[in-house]
Amino acid sequence: MNTQTAPSPQFYLTAPAACPYLPNQMERKVFTHMVGERAPELNDLLTQGGFRRSQNIAYRPACETCRACISVRILTNEFAPTRSMRRVLAANGEIVSAEYPAEPSSEQYNLFRRYLDCRHQKGGMSDMSVLDYAMMVEDTHVHTKIIEYRLRVEGDGINDKARGPLIATALTDRMSDGLSMVYSFFDPALSERSLGTYMILDHIRRAKERGLPHVYLGYWVKGSRKMGYKTKFLPQEHLMARGWERYSGEHDSTKPATD
């Protein structure tokens, strides 16, 4: 009888580095590798515990004097779009979305590059090459999909694959209790369409159709303009010291705390 058990994941701590969200703060992260047959199960457990995935690595903040990064997930079964969100949906009625295996394309990378060059020129991803992008998409041992968003053009049938330009893309993990938006990007020339909001609304729809109660949005930092959009999608839960707590928009759940 084989009594061997699967090895437990090993966790590591990064060296301190400048925080990309808060001035005069240093960040550290705890991380582990997710490979092999247990990777999907481990991804579920870690994401539910506040980790995020990047390629085959799961990480979460482990800063010594700050707890400002708060994991956020939308409660899809209770979600109802606001008036402004309904306007976004109406304005993008001609968009067609389709789900594919996690495989990169030159069209995706060209859009990704335009997005970074316009929105994140000084970010940590600003110098990513086409090979880096391919690794970001393909290096996964979990249930990952690419969702492409295109404009329908004249001549497209209802059931046809859209032939219009690629205007947005999302890299998404399917988990047992929801969808996790790993990374998304869009055409910066179409900012009036609010494509970031549209993709989140589309993920809420997809999760509902699959009977999944959550859409995971990653981290939110109060006062960060980069992350302010995440708290518009209510109701949602924030991962606090006692577990996932419902967020109403009234309490200051991101006040930095010290140990």
UniProtKB/Swiss-Prot annotation:
UniProt keyword list: Acyltransferase, Cytoplasm, Transferase
Reactions that this protein is recorded to catalyse: N-terminal L-glutamyl-[protein] + L-leucyl-tRNA(Leu) = N-terminal L-leucyl-L-glutamyl-[protein] + tRNA(Leu) + H(+); N-terminal L-aspartyl-[protein] + L-leucyl-tRNA(Leu) = N-terminal L-leucyl-L-aspartyl-[protein] + tRNA(Leu) + H(+)
One annotated GO biological process: ubiquitin-dependent protein catabolic process via the N-end rule pathway
GO cellular component, one term: cytoplasm
Molecular functions (GO terms): arginyl-tRNA--protein transferase activity; leucyl-tRNA--protein transferase activity
EC numbers for this chain: 2.3.2.29
Principal subcellular localisation of the protein: cytoplasm
Family: Belongs to the R-transferase family. Bpt subfamily.
HAMAP family for the chain: Bpt
Annotated protein name in UniProt: Aspartate/glutamate leucyltransferase
Gene: bpt
